Amino acid sequence: MPAKLSVNLNAVAMLRNRRDLPWPSVTGLGRAALAAGAAGLTVHPRPDQRHIRFSDLGDIRALIDDEFPQAEFNIEGFPSEAFLDLVEKHQPEQVTLVPDDPTQATSDHGWDFVSRSDFLAPIVARLKAGGMRVSLFADPDPLGYERAAAIGVDRVELYTGPYGATYDDPAAATRELDRLEKAANAATALGLDINAGHDLTVDNLPALVKRIPQLSEVSIGHGLTADALMYGMPVTVSRYIAALA
């Protein structure tokens, strides 16, 4: 079964926030993505609300519940108490925990599972008790994956930024794919499902899914939004789904 596509709406929200105006509509483009076949929507609300606003979360939850009940809502973020309160309020199907500093422009590394498993364990338990699937952002290095499995995580999301950066270097792309494949196989052996995200595009997805056929989901924002400016959201989503096939 092909990996599912979750459309990250942060870039849409960032464009909206350049003006004190309600467009482009985050929920409007989310609706277009889901209508075109996306399996879910992803957001990463940061404390300063520089792209996704806290008020967007209820709107997206309502959009999915009212119009696309088969779709999933994925909320990413560092597990501060404020973040945990947000996800417990809006009940996404999946919570993806990332080790970001709040001032970071974007997620650029995974968790150190060896040193942070004691911090993460009660958070994972709390979210799972609330009925949410939990994924942890992970570097493509299997060191410590057994710690992630031991604390009850459902999935790891492989950080694909270094792979995305090899768009003009085929040899480097092959090396990064080797790392990702090895990491994915190690996670699968531990009973973890695999997500992936960061700098994925129509061009680099086919090689990734060929190497990791067990991939459950990709969340894509920047590249997909850039393509949507050229082709429109419905056509763009269709192209990404085809790239995952």
Swiss-Prot record:
Intrachain disulfide bonds: none
Q: What class of enzyme is it?
A: transferase
UniProt-annotated site: Transition state stabilizer, residues: 157
Pfam families from the xrefs?
Answer: PdxJ
What pathway does the annotation place this protein in?
Answer: Cofactor biosynthesis; pyridoxine 5'-phosphate biosynthesis; pyridoxine 5'-phosphate from D-erythrose 4-phosphate: step 5/5
Chain positions recorded as 3-amino-2-oxopropyl phosphate binding sites: 8, 19, 199, 221-222
Q: Which GO terms describe its molecular function?
A: pyridoxine 5'-phosphate synthase activity
Quote the subcellular location field of this record: Cytoplasm
| EC number(s) per entry | 2.6.99.2
- Cellular component terms, GO, for this chain's entry? cytosol
Active-site residues are 44 (proton acceptor), 76 (proton acceptor), 198 (proton donor)
For this protein, what reaction is catalysed? 3-amino-2-oxopropyl phosphate + 1-deoxy-D-xylulose 5-phosphate = pyridoxine 5'-phosphate + phosphate + 2 H2O + H(+)
Q: Print the keywords alphabetically.
A: Cytoplasm, Pyridoxine biosynthesis, Transferase
Main site of residence? cytoplasm
Asked if the Swiss-Prot or TrEMBL record annotates the protein with the keyword Magnesium, the reply is: no
Residues given in the record as 1-deoxy-D-xylulose 5-phosphate binding sites: 46, 51, 106
HAMAP family named among the record's database cross-references:
PdxJ
Q: What does this protein do?
A: Catalyzes the complicated ring closure reaction between the two acyclic compounds 1-deoxy-D-xylulose-5-phosphate (DXP) and 3-amino-2-oxopropyl phosphate (1-amino-acetone-3-phosphate or AAP) to form pyridoxine 5'-phosphate (PNP) and inorganic phosphate.
Q: Quaternary state and partners of this protein?
A: Homooctamer; tetramer of dimers.
User: Which family does the entry's similarity section mention?
Assistant: Belongs to the PNP synthase family.
What is the protein named?
Pyridoxine 5'-phosphate synthase
To which species is this protein native? Brucella anthropi (strain ATCC 49188 / DSM 6882 / CCUG 24695 / JCM 21032 / LMG 3331 / NBRC 15819 / NCTC 12168 / Alc 37)
What is the phylogenetic placement of the source species in the record? Bacteria, Pseudomonadati, Pseudomonadota, Alphaproteobacteria, Hyphomicrobiales
